[in-house]
Regions:
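Catalytic core of membrane glycerolipid acyltransferases/transacylases, capturing the structured
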Residues: 1-41
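Alpha-helical structural signal in soluble globular domains
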Residues: 4-5, 86-89, 146
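Soluble extracytoplasmic domains of inner/organellar membrane proteins
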Residues: 13, 19, 36, 42-44, ...
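A secondary-structure boundary/capping signal
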Residues: 14-15, 32, 64-66, 122
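A cross-family acyltransferase "interaction/gating" segment
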Residues: 22-26, 56-62, 71-135
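Membrane-interfacial terminal anchoring regions of lipid-handling membrane enzymes
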Residues: 135-148
Length: 148
């Protein structure tokens, strides 16, 4: 999705468990993906630092601030601590995005892959340096104010 909708190189931050999926994980590495160990703060910080370097090098990084795929369309889960660090440390804007119907490709009827109409909605870019200190502390408010 990222490579067909974003005009620049992109990567994703994914959970470390994705490394165990043959072929997919190899493709992800080639596509600038980083694997986040959510159970190890030190390793997680290393991943974020690598992500900062990728952004500074011109690669847009997709993050999933809720820390998991949200199966509901009606409400956001709380954002994970650190989900804004790439933007904070690089000064790059956050472009909110919603992905709808992606589970219909594979997840809802595994192992079959089904052609599906996936909807991508982009919100207004958010510049953290233009937010109040309170808004930066409560990153969930970003969805309420600027969500896709």
């Amino acid at each position: 999705m990222g490579y067909t909708t974003v005009p620049a190189p992109t990567g994703f931050i994914a959970k470390k468990e994705m490394i165990g999926i043959p072929l997919l994980s190899q493709w992800m590495v080639q596509m600038n993906c980083l694997f986040l160990d959510r159970s190890n703060i030190k390793e997680g910080l290393k991943t974020i630092l690598t992500g900062i370097e990728k952004v500074k090098g011109g690669i847009s990084m997709w993050i999933f601030p809720e820390g998991t795929r949200n199966k509901t369309e009606d409400e956001m889960l709380p954002f994970k601590a650190g989900s804004l660090k790439l933007s904070e440390k690089t000064g790059c804007p956050i472009v909110p995005m919603a992905i709808t119907n992606s589970a219909d490709i594979l997840e809802n009827h595994f192992p079959k892959v089904k052609p599906t109409h996936v909807i991508l909605q982009y919100g207004t870019p958010i510049y953290l340096d233009q937010l109040s200190a309170d808004d930066r502390k409560t990153s969930c408010c970003l969805y309420t104010k600027y969500g896709a």
